[in-house]
Amino acid sequence: MELSWVRLAWMTKVTELHAGARRGDLPAMRRLLESDPKLANARSETDARGTFPLHVAAEAGQTEAARLLLEYGAEISTTDLENEAHALGWVAFFGRPDIVEMLLAAGSAPSQRNKHGLTPLGCALGGTEGRWRKFSDASIEDWHRAAEMIRAKGGVE
């Protein structure tokens, strides 16, 4: 019985961290990460996409949340379950150039393909063509900036 309570407490913290990353709630995120830094690499068990906090911050365009997660050891190479995409693929897809720059500086591989065969550059270029507008509030300029940064680091389509 005790193990189930421990598991429930862990899942609650993971859910809270993902929610904090989505909102950019740095104080709440810092509190959780200070209590258990392993949370930075905890896959959501309530999101069917199987995301990590860094994916959520990327999707929401929460640059400072992404920076905090990296400070606490978030892995840049983890992939979600739905698309098997790294965080760089997520930020490129959602048109978040500031986080693209951050992940590239942290050593994220610019040519990793997701399960659909798309690279981060391919994701960003899809945004410049307007294909992802229904998923993101990014501007076409944001997608162009993201694509140029990825291309400059050797990203391929």
Predicted region positions:
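Ankyrin-repeat-protein effector appendages
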Residues: 2-16, 106, 125-157
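N-terminal segments that cap or nucleate solenoid repeat domains
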Residues: 3-49
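Ankyrin-repeat boundary/"N-cap" motif
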Residues: 11-17, 43-53, 79-86, 113-126
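Ankyrin repeat A-helix N-terminal signature
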Residues: 19-24, 56-62, 90-96, 123-134
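Conserved ankyrin/ankyrin-like repeat signature
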Residues: 28, 64-65, 98-99, 132, ...
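Hydrophobic packing within well-folded, soluble alpha/beta domains
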Residues: 29-32, 54-57, 66-69, 88-91, ...
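Ankyrin repeat domain, specifically the short helix-to-loop turn at the C-terminus of the second helix
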Residues: 33-39, 67-75, 101-109, 149-156
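A generic tandem-repeat structural signature
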Residues: 75-99, 105
